[in-house]
Amino acid sequence: MSVSSIADKIVSESILIVDFGSQVTQLIARRVREAGVYSEIVPFNRAEEAFQRLQPKGIILSGSPASVVAEGSPRAPESFFQAGIPIFGICYGQQVMCHQLGGKVTANDVDGEFGRAFIDVIAPSPLFENLWKVGEKHQVWMSHADRVEALPEGFKPIAVSDGAPFALIADEKRRFYGMQFHPEVVHTPDGGKLIAHFVHDICGLAGDWTMAEFRQTKIAEIRKQVGDGRVICGLSGGVDSSVTAVLVHEAIGDQLTCVFVDHGLMRQGEAEQVVSLFREHYGIKLVHVNAEDRFLAGLKGVTDPETKRKFIGKTFIEIFEEEAKKIGGADFLAQGTLYPDVIESVSFLGGPSVTIKSHHNVGGLPERMNMKLVEPLRELFKDEVRDLGRELGMPDVFVDRHPFPGPGLAIRIPGEVTKERCDILRKADAVYLEEIRNAGLYNAIWQAFAVLLPVRTVGVMGDGRTYDSVCALRAVTSTDGMTAEIYPFQPEFLANVATRIVNEVRGINRVTYDFTSKPPGTIEWE
């Protein structure tokens, strides 16, 4: 199959997800992708345009904080119901479908269903063939006040709950399905399978969307967009920019130049790893700027976390712009923008409006230098970027790397940042991560790091008194970084790490562990 044919195949074998403003719409896309089918999320007021572009094989209508019976609440394009393709309505999506097709929805401010609920399957359906059987009871997750009171013509109930007589409905002839619960959340145990049944059995999609196909498609798109032009890419050493650089280089070779601004605030050995991988292993043209002195000079005397962040971000952009001008002739800027950065969100306060989340890793640089953006990862979620990195043959040490903040160690050193304190923290952090890897725990943890506190305590080493710094250890589990739980290390593990740090890292004589979840705390200390 040719590259252009692969691109056409991905677009034609897709699911369109219409967003009515639900907080969990992204999870719908995740479940469809997990079923091996490409999906796109669009706000309801741009859905018709997206439908014409994608020509999807099925439509999913999301939930919403709005009420179908409220004046001005969002609607699906009427043309969707005449298109002859399957539709899957979730919560508000079910209600709006029923309302637009002649059913009745009532507002309910008293006794809605919220949280775990159970549905009883009362009729068979191709939607859950070989998954659920008539007479069975299944756990789902509800979050609704309004509910459907009367079904449109052609629909019948196929599952009920205590608070929803039409918990799951079907018009099998038109292949329209609606459910009052949320199959996209993990609290509906069979929800992912239900969505997979919809895209495979109802929409007839094979589920063969793979990273290998995505890779070839993106290579073709990059070559078409860039032509004979030149591209620069800012490398941070993180997963997103690294995968972007390798993919773009595979597409256009020496037309790409990467700029790696080393601010002296990276983890131990990280700068050397970046240079080695990209310059020596991949043969990518790389400009390595050692700007440690410039950053540390600007941070002298600075203790406020926000001031640190702003200075580091501003200085990074200045240096990147200086280097880009030295390179000269660049027509494009490659960025590691991801799908959550560009999904359009919908607000209903004061009427429907669309806010597009912007994501510029180098601020306004593209506009100031008259460059066009190349964003090959903009359709991917974070874990899919890691999958693409593996598909590209990148080393696990880069692909599976824990998130690392742009300001680096500066926000893991509360108080003034100095070279001496950076060096102390680097060593402690390296010991901690080494022990985590040795225990086989690295990939079970979302993020782990050490923090060097601006606190000194008395200790005893040998026969002498010490008065040195305190190191705090942090490790959390998370799926998206929005919320996080502490990682439950065994006490023996933490005791071993603490012993190694105080013995091997001069300048630290006490180690603590941070037991704070997010919320109320943040993952980073500053």
Swiss-Prot record:
The active site is at C91 (nucleophile), H182, E184. Its EC number is 6.3.5.2. Pathway: Purine metabolism; GMP biosynthesis; GMP from XMP (L-Gln route): step 1/1. It catalyses: XMP + L-glutamine + ATP + H2O = GMP + L-glutamate + AMP + diphosphate + 2 H(+). GO terms for molecular function: ATP binding; GMP synthase activity. It comes from the Bacteria. This is GMP synthase [glutamine-hydrolyzing]. It comes from Zymomonas mobilis subsp. mobilis (strain ATCC 31821 / ZM4 / CP4). The lineage of its organism: Bacteria, Pseudomonadati, Pseudomonadota, Alphaproteobacteria, Sphingomonadales. The gene is guaA.
